[in-house]
Amino acid sequence: MKKISIITPSFNQGQFIEQTIDSVLSQNYNNLEYIIIDGGSKDNSVEIIKKYQKYLHYWVSEKDNGQSDAINKGLKLATGDIFNWLNSDDYYEPSTFKKINEYFTPDDVLVVSGRNNILKDNLIVRISSGLYLYNSLEKTIGNAKIDQPGTFFRKDAIDKMGLLNPSLHFIMDREWWIRYLLLFGLNGIKKVDDVFVNFRIHNNSKTNSFQDDFVKEALNLYYSIASIYNVPEASKFEKYFKISLIPEFIKLPNISTDLLQKSLHYFWLHQGNISYAHDDYKTAALFLSLINVEFLQKEDAQLYFSLKNRIKFLPPFLKKLINRIR
C-alpha cells in the first residue's frame, strides 16, 4: 500500500472544512499522511481542525503568502509516495485513496487524473471532463488544463518539478502541470473516468469570483514562457497585451524552442475559441490574428478557419438566435 500525502490549505472556510477533513480521514486508508496548513483563519476553522488534530500528521495556523505558499509549506513536509492537495471547501468521494493506490501501478505511472463533481448549492450541476490530453505535446501544453483536485502525482515526479510558484494565485496548478509536460512529455499519465472529488462553486470560491484574474495570469504565464525561453512570439504578447513576467519563474534546462513556439500558437487558438464562445468577437479576432496556421495540425487549422469565418459572417445577435433555436 503506497503512502499518500494530502495537504489542505485553508483560510476562513469554517463552513466547509469539517466535511473536507472528514472526507480525507473517512477513507480509512492506513498509509495516509494528512497535513493542514491554515493561513491564520479568524473564523471557527482552527476550532474544527483541533477536533481532528490527533489524526493529522501536522497542522499549523499562521499567516502565509497565499494558497501556493501554504501548499509549498506542506510539500516540504510531505513524505508520501503519492501527493495531492485538497482545498478546504472541497471533499473526496468514498474509496478514492483505494482506487488511487491501485491506479499507480506499474511504477512508471507518474500521474493519475480522474474527474470531479461540480457542485453549486450542494447539487451536482455537471461532471468535469478531466485532464486535457491530446495526441500532440504542443497542443496539450497550449491548451493546458488540469483538473487539480482529481489529479494525483507521484512524489518522484514532484521532486523534479519543484515547488509551486508562490507568486501565482490562480493558475499555479496549470503552471506546475506545464512543468510536468516539459519534463516528461505525455509519458507516465493515466487518465481515468472515476469521479474522485466534489468541487464546490460558491460566492467566495476563486473559480466563481476571479475569472478575469485567471485569464490575466494565463497571459502572463505564456508570455513568461515565450520571453524566458527566447521564443520570438514574446514580442507579440508585448505588442498587444498588458502583460508582465511572472516572478520566480523556474526555467527548465534543454527545452525545445520549436515545441514552445507551437504551443504558444495553440494557446492563442484556445483563447480565441473561448473568446468567441463568450461572444467577445474583438478579443477572439485578436488572438486568431497572432496565429501562424502552419504550426497547427490539420483539424486545428480547420477550427482556426472556421472561427475566422464565423467572426466575419455570423454576427453575435444571429449566433445567439441560432443557439436559442438549438
What are the roles of these predicted feature ranges?
Residues 22-31:
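Short, acidic, metal-binding catalytic loop of nucleotide-sugar glycosyltransferases
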Residues 45, 71, 92-99, 122-123, ...:
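Acidic donor-diphosphate engagement hotspot in glycosyltransferases and nucleotidyltransferases
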Residues 62-78:
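Glycine-rich, basic loop-to-helix element that forms the pyrophosphate-binding segment
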Residues 91, 95-126:
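Conserved donor NDP-sugar-binding/catalytic core segment of glycosyltransferases
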Residues 227-229, 243-326:
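Membrane-interface aromatic/basic loop that binds lipid-linked glycans or pyrophosphate carriers
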